[in-house]
Amino acid sequence: MARPGQAGPALGEFLTALHDRWRSMSRDELVAVLGTHAERLPVRERQAFLDIFVGPGADAAPTAPGRRVGVDLMARIAAFKARVAAGEYAGDDDGGYHWDGYGWADEESAAWVPDAESLFADIGDVFVAGDLVAARTAYESLLEPFLRGGDDDWPLELWQLESTDVPEMVARYVRCVYETTPADQRVDAVLRAFLELPEERALSLAEVSATRVDALPDLDAFLPGWIVGLLTASGFPSVRDEVRLLAEAAAMHGGADALADLARRPGRHQGGIGVVWIDALTAGGCLSDARAAAEELIDLPGVEAVQRAKAADRLAHLLGHEGDTSAAVTARRRAWTTHPTRARLLALAATCQGAGVLVQTLAAEADALELAWTSSGRTGPDRLGCELLLLAGRLDAAIAALTDASPLGWHHAVHPGPVVLPFLWAAATGTAPLAGDGHLGQLYADIDLDPAALPRPEDWSGWDGTPSRPPDHSQRPEPAEPTLTGLLADAIGRLRDDAGAREEWLVIAGAVSDARIAAIVTGKHRGAYARAAALAYAHAEALAKMGKQRQAHDHLAAVRARYPRHSAFRGEFDAAATSSTLRARAT
């Protein structure tokens, strides 16, 4: 199986699958397949393909193209390192990489890259030929400039290599270390290799094993010491890396029982291993054991909050599968209060809906939230807290958080603006707009964008940073049910039918919108001009929905006239008219 980012299977997996397919084919079938493949080869690849086969009168297969081993290879590696140390590649370290406003772009390879690529390819030939001692010696020598630096002690970067499959190369090197180290020293040597290599964070024993057809030898004897070594190692900068390797080793060594032992052993790995333990039991169909494991992990001393919340998530799912909805609600509430996230709020709502206790549960959680921030002396809830308050019908508290917040910085995940403002417009009009209903509908639909789940801040609906490509709404995946916008629409339906309150919400929304537009335009945040224009049109659309057509057009005219010297903003403002349910009057 190909690893993430890899173009195909590892060598061992590939050769095993290839041999399996060969065995079922006759000579004629094999010749036909090779002939068909040869017919489709590009011109530049034909001679290399032909050279694979022994020509008439030849005694043996030729040496693989470009292979130069032994003293010659080590001499070329030494010469390469000397050039690096002497600074012959100085000035080309960045390889032409530059920031183009959207990401890092490269114009050409660094000068050292072709030389390094050739050397790594030749070492790969040595590895494939089975001389792991020579391959290890060569790898260790060539990797020195990448690990300890060259000119001015700046290390070369493996990620700049283009034709070399770096993850496979690293796995091959570790395989060499494993097989050429005496058994009593193997754990320390392999662990040192994992910790030193730049790519060790994405490496696993399974990937090391897959570099050859034969599995890693003596793995059963290696694993107990490997687990102890991982537990006592101090070089892992990330708990996730440690947990990943421990989970793999435990699964290989003793399955769920080994995972349970690790989860009960104090250390920073406990929570992550505990979650893996629960998942392994669930995948194996041992649901009652998985439930017991989740209950144990939730209250296990020393486990961090995020992992206890994950255990509560899994417990709620298992309880729901058993039909115990009341206990499932309790588990969802435990997960939410332990480590609040948008996903947990939605999961809580979904479980409560199924149990028929949504309104009272939201009210209880909102009470707890308001008590917590009042007793702590904080100024008010963040975006996630406001989402809970809106679902519970606590508009006054959410509005206070919105009006107290800065008119800028909406790209921060804690800012209440991207959720509370569209909700206020929807509440003022009495109904949630459809996604295609002008700017108002789009801003409301954007509520479902969870900042914690977006890879780039530029994709956030409230982004007011440097100019960037606008989010492509058509490429967004459909959010899972229940959606926050759907739940908020239900909450709007539960609000009191008070015309005075609706008018007040509209006035507040207009004031917040105007303040944000002013902050963006006067601050010359050009990347957010289009979003500022969208706010103006959204407010006008809300006015129109409430039967205030004249006020809607007057509002648009006033906003445009307010910034006579900001031609870039006025251009975005005029362009926004094409996406609105309204049209600005001629000025």
Where do the PLM segments sit?
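Eukaryote-biased, non-catalytic alpha-solenoid scaffold regions
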Residues: M1-T587
